[in-house]
Regions:
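Conserved acidic residues
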Residues: 16-17, 109
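Short, hydrophobic/glycine-enriched beta-strand segments
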Residues: 17-24
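Conserved, mostly hydrophobic/aromatic
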Residues: 20, 113, 284
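Flexible, glycine/proline-enriched loop segments at strand-loop-helix junctions
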Residues: 27-31, 85-90, 126-137
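N-terminal glycine-rich anion-binding loop in soluble enzyme alpha/beta folds
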Residues: 28-29, 33, 37-79
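Glycine-rich anion/phosphate-binding loops
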Residues: 86-106
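Internal, conserved structured core segments that host functional sites
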Residues: 103-185
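Acidic, Ser/Pro/Thr-rich low-complexity regulatory regions
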Residues: 154-326
Length: 326
């Protein structure tokens, strides 16, 4: 079986680049002079990705240590001020830096933000009202600018990466995004777009069979629409679809679909083993990696050209073991 997700990047001259809040990489840039080093990022993702670190607060000239800042006022357009009530207001400086930086992230294929940060928090950031009470409805100023300027860029915050499903989904989206960027750099063509779709069919099916059919129908109009416009519409929809986690039921549907390609190639005993292990996954008795590994074993013995192209079987490096907990 081919391993497209790795071959295109891991064996090449460059690794996929991820933006990361600097404190998560161990940089002592927090207001108290400390850091929030994240083991998963550094010790696991760090072996496969190149990190580009950002600390908006240090970038605008705030020292370390420094008074902490917090968001106040309107949840939709809060101001970033000192928590000490000393009159320090860095809103404008943060917004200018964030807007300028967010427009220059073309080389990144994903971003991991520091949760709860008034500059980097992706969601549920505290915003204080006049009464001093806080609502957890805000977004950090820098994180908001990055997401607005790069709406298709896969983003997460480190706290959510503790969830195995969210973790696997994020990394999978990063690799899809990277493959798309590589396609665009090599030159968009009708063939390249159709090849991209073909290789991602089962991955899309695992997330949404309806969207999989919708995207196929969209590409069926290639001859009647501008390639650039249609490609943009296509990839926007792909990233929307992949943002929702694939359910166990839909994974089972894909596994059974793959099994169909082996029905004439394997004997009754091996077919029964495959059916049994897929059912064990359906019942939550084994993780997703188990039926996929067994299917890959049989496809190595009985290669199928269409199946060998499917990103679903190898959406990210095996060494990350992201499907071992799904």
């Amino acid at each position: 079986m081919s391993n497209e997700s790795q071959t295109a990047f891991e064996n090449g001259p460059e690794r996929i680049r991820l933006g990361v809040s600097a404190c998560l990489l161990g940089a002592r840039v927090r207001f108290d002079g400390g850091h929030k080093r994240n083991r998963f990022l550094i010790e696991e993702l760090g072996t496969h990705f190149e990190f580009v670190s950002f600390c908006p607060e240090v970038a605008i000239g705030l020292g370390t240590p420094r008074p902490s800042i917090r968001l106040v006022g309107d949840v939709q357009a809060p101001r970033a001020v000192s928590s000490k009530g000393d009159g320090l207001d860095v809103t404008d400086a943060l917004r200018v830096y964030s807007a300028n930086t967010a427009q220059r992230l073309d080389g990144l294929c994903g971003f991991v933000f520091k949760k709860d940060s008034p500059s980097c928090g992706m969601e549920r950031v505290k915003v204080y009202g006049d009464s001093g009470m806080a609502q957890r409805d805000g977004t950090g100023i820098f994180a908001q600018a990055v997401q607005q300027a790069n709406p298709l860029l896969p983003v997460e915050e480190e706290g959510r990466l503790n969830d195995p499903g969210l973790r696997e989904n994020f990394v999978s989206r990063v690799y899809v995004y990277a493959r798309w960027q590589a396609l665009r750099q090599q030159g968009l063509s009708k063939k390249a777009l159709l090849d991209f779709h073909t290789s991602h069919k089962l991955l899309l099916m695992a997330h949404s069979p309806a969207a999989y059919r919708e995207l196929g129908s969209l590409l069926g109009r290639l001859d009647n629409a501008g390639l650039e416009v249609l490609a943009d519409r296509y990839f926007e929809r792909v990233m929307q679809v992949l943002k929702a986690q694939a359910s166990r039921k839909r994974h089972v549907n894909v596994l059974q679909h793959l099994l169909g390609y082996l029905r004439k190639q394997v004997d009754a005993v091996n077919r029964a083993d495959l059916v049994e292990v897929i059912d064990a996954y359906r019942r939550g008795l084994v993780p997703l990696v188990v039926p996929i590994t067994l299917l890959q074993h049989h496809f190595r013995r009985n290669p199928h050209p269409w199946v060998s192209r499917q990103v679903y079987l190898n959406p990210h490096p095996r060494e990350l073991m992201l499907r071992n907990s799904l």
